[in-house]
């Protein structure tokens, strides 16, 4: 019938229009380099246009194979320099590669090959989480095109920078009972970092502003850097298991340093096994510290989302935007 013919024509036009929209979207995705900012198209799925599949991003097809997430870069000058790219996060998406780096002071990377490798990262911002005293002893190397910001990632309640001098440690431990294995010191240090941290506020400001690739680091890339990385992963929707695994990966990256410290204090450890973890933490991290951080956040704020909004201004809308920026 005439009505049936008109409906059939409208269906074909709708199918072709739908296919054209998908072609346009895939073109935009290709031009934007696989940007996650394009929302899913509403409506029913499009049929292939002229029996050809909808185009996918050529950039994604041409992308080189990536290593296992958390694999450190091979620098002669130091260990534990790695990125957050590749980790699974919100809605099963993954963190974009080459954007968020966690590492060590760039002054340690003095060799020609190390400098070339560092320069090739195309860093726009280096956030140094060390104290001013640490920075004066070993100032960072800043590649062309990058800018350096130094904000201590561990400060006392009065704003005084903690430099791990005896007086600073005593002030940090005020109100805590010292334990044989040193676990209370780690808890005091990590809990202090979680609240009112100006360095971490700058870190999230830079991420929201798209000031990437970014490198954040402390002296060994394990404690101040480790907590900062945990918070980024938390904000991007990674699971607790992923967050803890990245934190603990420091022990794999710094195995040689850990073994050396334990060997140096072998006699003392044999006489008093309880002190083993104290020495272990000098070069590595305590696996129990990451779950402690997550528990502390949720105990005070009820949820990670409440914490991120209260401490860093990441409202639900801003958090969603951050995830669109760094997940794919």
What positions do the PLM features span?
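Gram-positive cell-envelope targeting signals
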Residues: 29, 33-50, 56-59
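N-terminal, intrinsically disordered charge-dense segments
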Residues: 13-14
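Cys-dependent protein tyrosine phosphatase-like superfamily
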Residues: 49-215, 228-328
């Amino acid at each position: 019938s005439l009505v049936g013919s008109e409906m059939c024509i409208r269906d074909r036009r709708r199918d072709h229009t739908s296919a054209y929209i998908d072609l346009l979207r895939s073109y935009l995705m290709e031009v934007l380099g696989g940007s996650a900012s394009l929302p899913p198209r509403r409506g029913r799925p499009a049929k292939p246009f002229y029996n050809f599949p909808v185009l996918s991003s050529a950039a994604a097809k041409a992308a080189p194979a990536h290593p296992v997430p958390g694999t450190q870069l091979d620098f002669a000058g130091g260990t534990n320099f790695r990125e957050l790219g590749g980790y699974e996060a919100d809605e099963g998406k993954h963190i974009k590669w080459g954007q968020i780096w966690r590492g060590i002071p760039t002054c340690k990377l003095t060799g020609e090959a190390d400098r070339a490798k560092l320069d090739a990262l195309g860093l726009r911002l280096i956030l140094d989480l060390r104290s001013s005293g640490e920075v004066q002893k070993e100032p960072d190397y800043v590649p062309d095109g990058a800018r350096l910001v130094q904000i201590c990632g561990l400060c006392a309640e009065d704003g005084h920078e903690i430099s791990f001098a005896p007086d600073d440690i005593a002030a940090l431990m005020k109100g805590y009972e010292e334990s044989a294995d040193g676990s209370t010191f780690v808890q005091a240090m990590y809990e202090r970092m979680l609240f009112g941290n100006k360095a971490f506020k700058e870190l999230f400001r830079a991420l929201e502003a798209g000031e990437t690739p970014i490198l954040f680091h402390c002296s060994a890339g394990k404690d101040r850097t480790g907590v900062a990385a945990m918070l980024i992963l938390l904000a991007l929707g990674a699971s607790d298991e992923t967050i803890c695994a990245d934190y603990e990966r420091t022990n794999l990256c710094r195995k040689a340093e850990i073994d050396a410290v334990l060997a140096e204090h072998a006699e003392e450890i044999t006489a008093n096994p309880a002190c083993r973890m104290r020495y272990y933490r000098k070069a590595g991290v305590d696996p129990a510290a990451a779950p402690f951080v997550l528990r502390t956040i949720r105990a005070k704020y009820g949820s990670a989302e409440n914490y991120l909004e209260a401490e860093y201004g990441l409202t639900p809308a801003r958090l969603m935007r951050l995830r669109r920026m760094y997940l794919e």
